[in-house]
Amino acid sequence: MKIKTIKFCSLFLYVLLIFQLVSAFPISFSNKNETLIVKDSDAITGLPNRFRDLTNLNISGSAQFTPSQIENIKNSINKPDICIVDLRQESHGFINDLAISFYSIGKDLNNGFTTEETISTEDKLLNSIKQNSQINIYDKLGKVLTNITVDSVSTENNAINKNGLKYQRFAVKDGGIPSTTVIDDFVDFIKNKPEGQHLHFHCDAGEGRTTTFMVLYQI
């Protein structure tokens, strides 16, 4: 009898633990196959997360930034010729002053895409967002964070150019390694870049891909 009671209590505790975990991380399965607009950053002041400037190498790196932070990056680097090197394979851009990306809980979006395919898909997704429309902004668990009115939509390239900076894209999977094509393109880019041009690398979190390319630059 005691053994049955112990087994029952163990099962009850196990079910309770599972319930608590599900409650703590509520995934909305109703939209698991939808393409969601998720928030990458809403910072309006200061520099982006994990910003570091290696002045002796004329390179810097960071996490994803918002439109408001572009001028801060420019002023902090303080060089006449700056090129932003975007390493994200995931489609992303700016809505109002939010940095956003397109994400699916149930699908690996843009997996295997070339840089050109990534940019083409990104342009289509951003162009589908109409000014003055109401849209939901999600987190990566599928939870709605907020609903906003769209005042402006922009690619990172356009926002960068408006601030007098140059832009270059190399699409690398989050958590992955660059393809041989991307590495070859990056080597050609470095060989042909203007002398004295400062490169600012970024991905989403400013860690894996950003650090990888900052190291590749030194090889």
Q: What feature does the model see in each segment?
A:
Residues 1-12:
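Bacterial N-terminal signal peptides that target proteins for export
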Residues 17-200, 212-219:
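Cys-dependent protein tyrosine phosphatase-like superfamily
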Residues 206:
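Conserved G/P- and acidic residue-centered "switch" motifs that form tight phosphate/ATP-binding loops
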Residues 209:
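Conserved SAM/SAH-binding loop-helix junction
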